[in-house]
């Protein structure tokens, strides 16, 4: 075994293996990850119990329905303008029964993340998930992490708080790496191979991407996800974030993390070992498996995801990444190597540019052009060793403002 400190995500270390049912707090309960996690819990009531829910407030009726069905103790909602609507919806469902505790405001999910439970599933989208991630770690909860942005923007902060084995990755690629890494030690690992579907625009040149529309970008060939993540998959920013995440989670240098395009999305990632063997984790595209690993590890949840029908012929293809058409992975490696506030700037600028693209204010190629310009202007980041939460927030605020300025300028020039 290596004498290096254990990585953030280590399949060899069981952080908290409790007997009986596990109490779960679900953050982002009305989103894609949250709804699928709740479905898994409802199918396995002997294994899991959801004790609290948090959501932004965009789907009030669903949040109230989830709370009632799961009989949770507390509900958190970020938007204060929907509190009365939520309270009314809860009263209609609960009748004369006592309502769950209601937490309101931007920090409501963070407060909930520190509440008593076994596991916090952070399914929030975006860097707003950082504070809940830190709160869950500080409170000693097992963290099933689907919110990759919190690790990206606050890597050194997360590493300072997390205990060995405390983080279990939920996204499909890192759940795959996590399982494959269980077959050996870090000293046995030659490289990590992260697979990418290639998105809806695989095979197109940069010039052919110039006229991509919102509808085109949201038509992902293999995964059903929210709009921001779907656009990130189309630009391959999502894959760039996953490269940074793999480095942080598994303590593997960037030059030993490779991205390959696998259109079928059957193989979710691979680990190549020093003896020349490669271990791949494969299932049909479905988030049930990664979610089950996140909240159930080291146990496996039966029938969490569909299995392959090996009696049917299938084709599995692998292609090199087109770095000219999709420069996002290379830029992500660059900011990951810079460290400090650079990943936060990259992520925040991208979030603003994706929002502008979805609103029709920025062309598809303009997303990465603008993000690249913002990263270049940021210059030397605050060092990772001295990084603080205010540093991250300040860098994000600057990056968002600068991205909006550059996006508006690019749009004005295009219309002139």
Where are these regions (language model features)?
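Catalytic, metal-anchored helix/loop core of enzyme active sites in primary metabolism
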Residues: 1-416
């Amino acid at each position: 075994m290596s004498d290096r400190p254990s990585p953030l995500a280590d399949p060899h270390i069981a952080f908290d293996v409790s007997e009986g049912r596990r109490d779960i707090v679900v953050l982002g309960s009305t989103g894609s990850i949250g709804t699928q996690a709740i479905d898994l819990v409802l199918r396995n009531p002997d294994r899991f119990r959801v004790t609290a829910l948090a959501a932004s407030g965009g789907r009030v009726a669903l949040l109230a329905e989830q709370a009632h069905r799961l009989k949770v103790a507390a509900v958190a909602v970020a938007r204060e303008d929907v509190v009365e609507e939520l309270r009314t919806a809860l009263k209609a469902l609960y009748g004369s029964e006592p309502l769950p505790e209601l937490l309101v405001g931007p920090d409501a999910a963070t407060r909930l993340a520190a509440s008593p439970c076994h596991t916090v599933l952070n399914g929030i989208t975006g860097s707003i998930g950082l504070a809940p991630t830190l709160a869950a770690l500080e409170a000693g909860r097992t963290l099933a992490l689907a919110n990759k942005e919190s690790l990206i923007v606050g890597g050194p902060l997360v590493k300072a708080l997390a205990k060995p084995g405390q983080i279990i990755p939920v996204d499909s690629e890192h759940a795959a790496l996590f399982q494959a890494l269980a077959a050996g030690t870090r000293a046995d690992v030659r490289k990590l191979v992260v697979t990418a579907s290639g998105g809806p625009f695989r095979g197109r040149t940069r010039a052919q991407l110039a006229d991509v529309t919102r509808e085109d970008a949201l038509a992902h060939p293999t995964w059903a996800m929210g709009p921001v993540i779907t656009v990130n998959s189309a630009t391959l920013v999502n894959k760039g974030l996953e490269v940074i995440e793999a480095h942080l989670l598994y303590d593997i240098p960037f030059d030993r993390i490779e991205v390959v395009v696998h259109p079928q999305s059957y193989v979710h990632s691979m680990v190549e070992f020093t003896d020349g063997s490669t271990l791949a984790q494969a299932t049909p595209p479905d988030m049930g498996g990664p979610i089950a690993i996140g909240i159930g590890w080291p146990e496996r949840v039966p029938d969490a995801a569909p299995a392959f029908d090996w009696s049917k012929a299938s084709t599995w293809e692998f292609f090199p990444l087109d770095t000219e058409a999709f420069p996002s992975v290379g830029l992500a490696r660059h900011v990951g190597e810079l460290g400090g506030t650079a990943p936060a700037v990259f992520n925040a600028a991208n979030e603003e540019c994706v929002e502008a693209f979805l609103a029709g204010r920025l062309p598809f190629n303009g997303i990465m052009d603008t993000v690249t310009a913002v990263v270049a202007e940021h210059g030397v980041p605050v060092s990772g060793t001295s990084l603080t939460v205010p540093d991250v927030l300040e860098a994000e605020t600057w990056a968002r403002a600068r991205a909006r300025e550059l996006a508006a300028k690019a749009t004005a020039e295009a219309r002139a």
